[in-house]
Amino acid sequence: MEPPLKPIAVDFDGGKLTSDGGVLLLGLADKNIRLTERINAIIFDPRNPLYIAHQQRDLIAQRIFAIAHAYEDVNDHIRLRHDPALLAAVKNTTDENQPLGSASTLSRLENRITEKEISELNKLFVELFIESYDTPPTQIVIDVDATDDIIHGNQEGGYFNGFYDNYCFLPLYFFCGGQLLWSQLRTSNKGGGFGAVAIFAYIAKRLKKEWPDVEIVFRGDAGFYSSTLLWYCERHGHKYILGFSSNAVLKRMSANIVFASEMFFVENGSQEPFRLFREYLYQAGTWKVPRKIIVKAERLPDKTADCRRQTTAEARRLYRISCCRLQTAVCRLL
C-alpha cells in the first residue's frame, strides 16, 4: 500500500531564505545516533534552569551543525541564530521569535568545558565507532596524523612550528576508514607523535575488550615512530606499519634497489612511474631485536629514483595495506 501523498506548497515571495538546507540531514542523522544528546550528558551545565533561554543540548547542536557547514567562527551566529534551516534542525521550528543562542552564549559554553570532559568526548567517538558495526570486524587499521591549525592574534598556547613555518596548534587525529576515533588539540612546540602512544593504547584496549579476536594495525608516518610504540604493539600483539627515517646504514642496504629502478626505467624508455620493493632485516642500535624494513624505490618520469622506508612487524601483507590506503588519514584532514 502506497503512503498517502502530502501536499507541497511553493511560493516565490522571498521571505526567510537559507543556503544551508543540508543541515536538515544533519539533524536527522543526529536523531539517529543521538550525538548531541550524548555530548550534552557529558558536559556539566552549571546554569540555573529557571533563568535560561536555551537548553545546553540545543547550543551544542547549533555549534556542531554550523561548523559542519564551514561556519567555524562564533561570530557567524549573529546571523545564523535566525537561519530557518538551522532552527528547524536544532529545535524543530522555524519560528523567528525563537532564535537560537547568541555568539556570547556559545562562547561561554565552549570556555567552561573542562579537559576531563574533552577526554570523555573523545571516548564517545570510540563508542560510536564500535556501535557502527553490526558484526565484529576481523581487522581494524588505525591511521594517525597531525596537521597545522593556524592561530590568529595572540591566542593562548600558540607557538611557532618550523615544519609548517607558522604559528599554529598541532592537533592529533586518529581515524579508521572514514570514522574519527580521537581528536586531540595540542600546542605545536611538541613533536608530531607526542601523546600518540597513550591514545592508541586506550583505543586498542577498548576495541579488544569489545572484539577480543580483532587484529589491530597501527599506521603512521615517520613522525610517529618511537621505540615505545614498537614495544607496546609487540607486547600486546598489535601490528604496525610506520615510516622510518633513513640513515647511512639503510642507504647502503638499499643502494642496489635504487640503482636497479633507475636502470630499468632508462633501459625500457618507460614514461610511467616504476617501483621496486625490497624487504630487509635491520636492527637499530637501540633495538633489542631486528625488525623488517620495507624499501620502496620509485622512479618518476621527471625525477631521479626516490627511496622510502617503512618498518613493520609483518612486512608483505601489511605493506599491501599501506600501499592501498597510504593517503587515508591525510585525505581526512584536507
PLM feature segments, named:
Residues 141, 217, 239:
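Hydrophobic "anchor" residues on beta-strands that sit immediately upstream
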